[in-house]
């Protein structure tokens, strides 16, 4: 069972949204009430495969920081 799992999906829409609002990874980490790390945010922007739980934490922190409601489909292409 040597099934190759796609891990890199290229830059994600969340990177453009964060840039448009002038946000950095530090902003999401500091506003999050959940355990969120810089590495998780960087991986999300770069397009590394993340678990649903991590994507939810990032979405919640982003929505809280800008006061808008983005869905998973708007932030991630996978």
Feature roles, as predicted:
Residues 26-35, 60-65:
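DNA-recognition alpha helix
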Residues 53-70:
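DNA major-groove recognition helix of helix-turn-helix/homeodomain DNA-binding modules
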Residues 30, 43, 77:
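Phosphate-coordinating loops and pocket residues in cytosolic domains that bind phosphorylated ligands
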Residues 2-3, 69-78:
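Short amphipathic recognition helices of helix-turn-helix/homeodomain-type DNA-binding modules
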Residues 1-29:
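A short, Lys/Arg-rich alpha-helix, primarily the initiator
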Residues 27, 38-40, 74:
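Residues in the helix-turn-helix
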Residues 34-50:
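Recognition helix of helix-turn-helix/homeodomain-like DNA-binding domains
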């Amino acid at each position: 069972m040597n099934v190759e799992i796609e891990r890199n999906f290229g830059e994600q829409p969340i990177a453009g949204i964060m840039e448009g609002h002038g946000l950095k990874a530090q902003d999401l980490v500091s506003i999050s009430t959940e355990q969120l790390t810089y590495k998780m945010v960087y991986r999300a922007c770069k397009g590394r495969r993340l678990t649903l739980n991590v994507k939810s934490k990032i979405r919640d922190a982003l929505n809280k920081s800008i006061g808008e409601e983005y869905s998973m489909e708007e932030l991630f292409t996978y």
